[in-house]
A protein has these predicted regions:
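Detector for methionine-enriched segments
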Residues: 1, 13-16, 155
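Basic/polar N-terminal segments that are highly enriched at the extreme N-terminus
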Residues: 1-5, 219
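Glycine-rich phosphate- or other oxyanion-binding loops that anchor nucleotides, phosphorylated ligands
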Residues: 34-219
């Protein structure tokens, strides 16, 4: 079944089904399939589930823009945090995104920077939330990983922002802390924190973003 998503809807990109389920239920979104990706929609929004990883998130964002003609993209979901300065389930508006596995330092570039680009992409932000940087890679980040302190880590944010920047589409990114990467967590703890973080981010999206326009900075 192909999507019937009309032009100029608000597009949402999430990596996992568990992150999509609260919005699907709340807005009674109808399912379709576009190029193998699950898409859920109503008259106002399109939500696509990319599955985890930088390639999947790049493709899914392109589909929202190119095939589904969305006017603005919001990526939301759970992320790791590299310090204990915030608690689990804290919700952030992402201000800058970095590609964590980029390394051209041998050519004289700063860490995380491609030779012909800045080291990060600047995003518009929601001023009602704390602002945080997010570092994206396909690598699971654990206690021994070499990452900056007090940042979010995920597997899709930079790619979403890069595609939106390429096509001049406004982009907002929201993340909720599901795990503290400096800690060793059991699988039971990970599962519990994941559900709580999903509930926190989806409650904010439903109650604050969709029911009231965000107060944005940097547009």
């Amino acid at each position: 079944m192909e999507s019937k998503c009309e032009i100029r809807k608000l597009g949402f990109m999430v990596a996992m089904e568990i992150e999509a389920e609260p919005l699907i239920r709340h807005f009674s979104l109808e399912k379709s399939t576009v190029h193998g990706f699950d898409v859920y929609e109503n008259d106002d929004i399109c939500l696509i589930i990319s599955e985890v990883g930088i390639i999947n998130s790049t493709l899914a964002t392109y589909i929202l823009i190119h095939d589904l003609k969305c006017r603005k993209i919001i990526n939301y979901g759970v992320a790791g945090f590299t310090n204990e300065s915030y608690r689990h389930c804290s919700v952030f508006s992402v201000g800058r995104v970095f590609k964590r596995d980029v390394d051209f330092t041998a050519l004289g570039c700063e860490p995380y920077r491609f030779p012909d680009k800045p080291s990060y992409i600047q995003l518009e932000t929601d001023s009602r939330l704390p602002i945080c940087d997010c570092y994206t890679s396909d690598e699971y980040i654990g206690p021994k990983s070499n990452v900056p302190k007090d940042v979010l880590v995920d597997m899709e944010a930079y790619c979403v922002a890069a595609v939106c920047e390429k096509y001049d589409i406004p982009c907002l990114i929201y993340k909720s802390i599901s795990d503290i990467t400096a800690n060793e967590n059991t699988q039971e703890q990970i599962d519990t924190y994941l559900k709580s973080a999903v509930d926190a981010i989806c409650d904010y999206i439903i109650d604050k973003v969709l029911n009231k326009a965000p107060v944005c900075q940097g547009e």
